[in-house]
A protein has these predicted regions:
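An N-terminal, well-structured beta->alpha segment
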Residues: 1-64, 381
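Glycine/threonine-rich beta-strand-loop-alpha-helix active-site module
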Residues: 74-179
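Carboxylate- and glycine-rich phosphate/diphosphate-binding segment that chelates Mg2+/Mn2+
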Residues: 150-256
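Catalytic phosphate/nucleotide-handling subdomain of diverse soluble enzymes
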Residues: 267-306
Length: 382
């Protein structure tokens, strides 16, 4: 069986990368951008950095800002209608996963009118046409949505997140500019950074992992582990390293899938609006313990990538514990809570467990699981 790997056509990396947006847009014959960016990024002038480049090059644009954290079906549908009226011929997504996921959904629906709304795109969608061309500019170091074939939209009425997978939605160009991430507060830097680490670790041990994805994931674990503390301290070196590390993780997990850390985090975002990275960070060590028997020697390599010394002389039990302890220590150092006590209500656990089991990420978990086992994992975290 062949392994597919889908990446951007082009990506730019490094401080000042956004200056090349106009060159790319003009070179591709684009005329008017539909710019997806959330209200806070507009308010604090982050979006303006990109708009200034467009205006300086004489490129037309329209801004769409009806985007919430954990974007909803309504955010997508109003975006589709706004795009139709705008006369735009391409999309620019500026932000974290929320802006990019909204833009991906809009682009796919516009290009595939047979799919009336995002609900019909849940799972692995059988679309025929590539998305409206999308240029992605991340402002967080975590989701890697600029290089993935996935997007996640919240169904508010049913309190659930829909995971949509479509290789036709990947941005054609990504601009990974650490200067666009420098305004992130410490808490957001920590949460998105732990999200990136979760991508790397889950992608490394997922059932679909193979040699090429393993290369990306181990390198991402190494980069993120050495740089997240510095990024939280807002050093330029830390920001640059995290921008790269989260992108490398995205290159991997987008092509092989994730596991039940994400399955368990998704309903927390849908029900409580919990920040995705915080949920992942809290759940990750507990699920690593649960998954350990199904991971062979991979935790030895995780521990090594996280800077643990002497792993070659450790027993299996020792290196597995060392890897999990290293994850817990990093999460603690960047200020992530240790449990879900302040988030989860015990009476909601049956709903959460069933939602997690039904989640599209669950089949990728290296260890077979059940609703009952996921229930116990949630209970252990409160």
């Amino acid at each position: 069986m062949a392994n597919r790997f889908v990446l951007n056509e082009t990506s730019y990396h490094g401080a000042g990368a956004i200056k090349d947006i106009a060159t790319e847009a003009k070179g591709r014959g684009f005329k008017k951008a539909f710019v997806c960016s959330d209200p806070d990024l507009i308010k604090f002038g982050v979006t303006k950095k990109v708009i200034d480049v467009l205006e300086g090059a004489g490129l037309d644009y329209e801004i769409y800002s009806n985007i919430k954290p954990n974007p909803t079906i309504e955010n997508v549908q109003t975006g589709v209608e706004a795009f139709k009226k705008s006369g735009a011929d391409y999309l620019i997504a500026i932000g974290g996963g929320s802006s990019m996921d909204t833009a991906k959904a809009v682009g796919i629906i516009i290009a595939n009118p047979d799919f009336a709304d995002v609900v019909s795109l849940e799972g692995v969608a059988d679309t025929k046409n590539k998305s409206v061309p999308l240029i992605a500019l991340p402002t967080t170091s975590g989701t890697a949505a600029e290089v993935t074939i996935n997007y996640v939209i919240t169904d508010v009425e049913k309190n659930r997140k829909m995971v949509c997978v479509d290789p036709k939605d990947i941005p054609v160009v990504a601009f990974v500019d650490p200067e666009m991430m420098s305004s992130m507060p410490k808490g957001l830097t920590a949460a998105t950074g732990m999200d990136a680490l979760t991508h790397a670790i889950e992608g490394y041990i997922t059932a679909g992992a193979w040699e090429l994805s393993d290369m990306f994931h181990l390198k991402a674990i190494e980069i993120i582990s050495r740089s997240l503390r510095n990024a939280v301290a807002n050093t330029p070196e830390g920001r640059a390293d995290m921008a790269l590390g989260q992108y490398v993780a995205g290159m991997g997990f987008s092509n092989v899938g994730l596991g039940i850390v994400h399955s368990m985090a998704h309903p927390l975002g849908a029900l409580y609006d919990t920040p995705h990275g915080v949920a992942n960070a809290i759940i990750l060590p507990t699920v690593m313990e649960y998954n350990a028997p199904a991971t062979g020697e991979k935790y030895r390599e995780i521990a090594r990538a996280m800077g643990v010394q002497g792993v070659d002389s450790m027993t299996q039990e020792e290196y597995r514990k060392a890897a999990i302890d290293a994850v817990r220590k990093l999460s603690e150092d960047v200020g992530i809570p240790a449990d879900l006590k302040a988030i989860v209500k015990e009476e909601d656990i049956p709903f959460l467990a069933q939602s997690a089991y039904d989640d599209a990420c669950r089949p990728g978990n290296p260890r077979e699981t059940s609703v009952e086992e996921i229930t116990e994992l949630y209970k252990s975290l409160i």
